UniProtKB/Swiss-Prot annotation:
GO terms for molecular function: ribosomal small subunit binding. This is Ribosome-binding factor A. Coiled coil: none annotated. Monomer. Binds 30S ribosomal subunits, but not 50S ribosomal subunits or 70S ribosomes. Belongs to the RbfA family. GO terms for biological process: maturation of SSU-rRNA. It holds the Pfam family RBFA. GO terms for cellular component: cytosol. Keywords: Cytoplasm, Ribosome biogenesis. One of several proteins that assist in the late maturation steps of the functional core of the 30S ribosomal subunit. Associates with free 30S ribosomal subunits (but not with 30S subunits that are part of 70S ribosomes or polysomes). Required for efficient processing of 16S rRNA. May interact with the 5'-terminal helix region of 16S rRNA. Its main location: cytoplasm.
Amino acid sequence: MANDRRVSRVSSLIKREVSQMLLMEIKDDRVGAGMVSVTDVDLSHDLQHAKIFVSIYGNEDAKAETMAGLKASAGFVRRELGQRIRLRRTPEVVFLEDSSLERGDRMLHLLDHIKTDRPPEDDDSEEE
């Protein structure tokens, strides 16, 4: 088992390398259907499993198509990681959609909606 600092370092290396692969090397047309960015990599403590969280911008059809393309290219990504990062064993790669940005945007929209619907507070109670 690796210590937390090593896990963090390897995780950031994987994030950087996969981001480069998404920009330049993955040739699957489905991956280009939506704009994709790597938001986080969750690496197990034994460095055997990597969950790669991606944010996909586009409509639902483009998101589904992009996720299918990413899942199909997981073997290529794993092989490339094995060549670029010197590890004893290359982790198994799983792509997951990260919808935290959309949830955060929706929460901000709801808070703005509540703020505009609330009547202004009166200071009449302080005058008494």
